[in-house]
Amino acid sequence: MRIALLWVAFGALALAAFESIGSFRSEFVQTIRSEDGKIIEYRGRVYAKSPYYGLWKYEKPMEKEIYIVDKQVVIYEPALEQATVSSLQNSIDFMALLRQSKRNSEGIYEATVFEQKYQILADEKGEPQKVFFIDKLHNEVQIIFKNAEINPVLEKEMFLFMPSGEIDLIRQ
């Protein structure tokens, strides 16, 4: 659940120079370093579309999918055959956050979402490459995007959780 909350927080993130970004697709590597120095690495794919759609598909070390549509989050864990549905107080809008972030004097974009500060690095074309933040549990979180595509065609239906077969559905 902690990982999901990190992604939910991240889903709200953004870059100001990225006003022309309406959708985003990328592979990612997420590294979490705890206060005691332990490191956990996750790999997967992320999809985002304006105005408020997000999908994080974790592939390693375990499969997990996080679907975000406005204020609703569904965390699906195939190995457990269960999905958790939660409602948020605030909408998570990845694209709006990209547009809201501001470039500092060092060329790093910064955004604050729900009192959480994020730093975003962009390449020479102004495309998001890396995100860094320290979460509420004092973990250092770094997300590196690889093979990113800006403004790919993404159908809204891909962001809707449609379980196949029987699963346990938990509502929070």
Swiss-Prot record:
Q: Which GO biological process annotations does it have?
A: lipoprotein transport
Signal peptide region: 1-16
Q: Which UniProt keywords apply?
A: Chaperone, Periplasm, Protein transport, Signal, Transport
This protein's GO CC annotations:
periplasmic space
Instruction: Name the SUPFAM superfamilies on file.
Output: Prokaryotic lipoproteins and lipoprotein localization factors (SSF89392)
Q: Where in the cell is it found?
A: Periplasm
Superkingdom: Bacteria
Into which family does the record put it? Belongs to the LolA family.
Concerning HAMAP family, the annotation shows:
LolA
What PANTHER family does the record tag this protein with? OUTER-MEMBRANE LIPOPROTEIN CARRIER PROTEIN (PTHR35869:SF1)
Task: Please explain the role this protein plays, according to its UniProt record.
Answer: Participates in the translocation of lipoproteins from the inner membrane to the outer membrane. Only forms a complex with a lipoprotein if the residue after the N-terminal Cys is not an aspartate (The Asp acts as a targeting signal to indicate that the lipoprotein should stay in the inner membrane).
Subunit structure, as described in the record? Monomer.
Q: What is this protein called?
A: Outer-membrane lipoprotein carrier protein
Gene for this chain: lolA
